[in-house]
Structures are given as structure tokens and as C-alpha cells.
Amino acid sequence: MVRQLIPAMLLPDRLYVMVGRGGNGAAASGAGTAGPRSYVSIMANQTAAAYLISISGAADAAAGVAGTATTNAGGAAGTIATATAAYGHGLGLWVAVAGQAGGAGGAGTGGAGTAITWGGSGVPISGGAGGGGTPTANTDNAGGAITGAGLFPTISGGAAAAGAGNHGVKLQRNPLWATCGGSGGGTAGAAGTAGRGGDASYGSGGGGGGGGVTGGAGGRGGDGLVIIAAW
């Protein structure tokens, strides 16, 4: 996430904005698709630092991690843009902040997906929560939730026995603008397909799919968002 304040006299009359689309969640046991960064440029189709007013991160958003019988890592946080990544970072006040990592899936020995606390990384967005894990005994577990804080509500995880994770939401009210990621899907241990992870809202991460004989698909990552205001 990047925030900038630039005197208008230092900017051209026309800017070109490319907003990154969220990466797709993968099917069972597969890795998701990485989401590209967002750019503000002084020339169309140019992303080199000498053309850029702003760039959202040092690298494209990491793809969601593929689940296995033993691993359950969450997706990595969005990277911090560097001062040299865009010449426009030196035109005014500039702050870059890392995103929030996704929650881990439930353990291979069985367990609920890891919940994500909204606002826990100091940004008004969130990673996606982890999907539930199921053991060889086929016990079902719920997906992780997005735990609300302040004015932001809790988004519950998918119920045990193949419940789908809930989609992330966007709040736009005075005095709050915020989004969150999707919650995790519940497991389907003995048969069937586990719950799908919830899709994310702007700038946030998709929820992890639940584990099972056939794991649930991961949720889609949120699209980027560029807001430009002048006064």
C-alpha cells in the first residue's frame, strides 16, 4: 500500500493508471495465480521507474500456497514499494506499507483454519483466512474467520462439513474506508468436495479452501485500487 501527497505543479496534465487484477484461487491442491501490481505513469504502457509516479509494491502479490497433507502455510504479505521504484516517489510526501499475510490452513492432523484479525498489520485491508484441515480420521473442521476490530465486523469462516468461506466486504462510511479478505472454507473429510475459500474485496487476500478427500478451491484475491484526489 502506498500513500502520496504531491504538489499539482509537479505533475503532468494527464496520468495513466493501470490497476492490478486480483489473482485467481486454484482448484484443490494447487497454487493460486499471482496478482499484478498497480501503477500510475506519465506515459501509457510504461512501467519503468523513470516513467512512474507511483507503484503499489516491490513485487507482484504472491500467489496463494498449494496445500498438501503436511503443509498449511498462508499466502505471503504484499511487499513494500521502494523509494527508487518510481521517480514520483521523490516529488512529495510518500509512505509505503506492507500488506498482511494470509492465515495458515488447519493442521494435517486436523484443526480449524487460522483466523485473521482485521487491522492487525496497521492497514485497512487484510489477508485471507486459512481453510480447515482434516485428519486421517476424517473429522471435519471449520475455516478460519476474519476477526473484526473497531467498526469492522467479523466475517465467519465456512462451517465444518464443506461450508464455503464468506466473501470479503468493503466498508465505505464516515469515518471508515476499509476492506477485508475472504474467510476460509470448511473441510469435507470423508467424501465430497471441501468448502471453497471466500473471495476478497479490494486489496485483500482470498480465503483458503478446506481440506478433504477433494480439497476446496482457494478464494480469488481482491483487485487493486487507485484513488486520486485533487484540491
What does each model-identified segment do?
Residues 1-152:
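Secretome/extracellular-domain signature
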Residues 127, 180-190:
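A C-terminal functional module that forms or caps the active site or interfaces directly
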Residues 129-131, 183, 206-211:
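Intrinsically disordered, low-complexity regions enriched in glycine and serine
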Residues 154-157:
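Composition-driven low-complexity repeats that form or flank extended alpha-helical/coiled-coil segments
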Residues 164-166, 186-195:
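Membrane-topology and secretion signals of cell-surface/extracellular proteins
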Residues 191-219:
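C-terminal, surface-exposed recognition/capping segments
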Residues 220-231:
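Short, structured beta-strand segments at or near domain termini in extracellular proteins/domains
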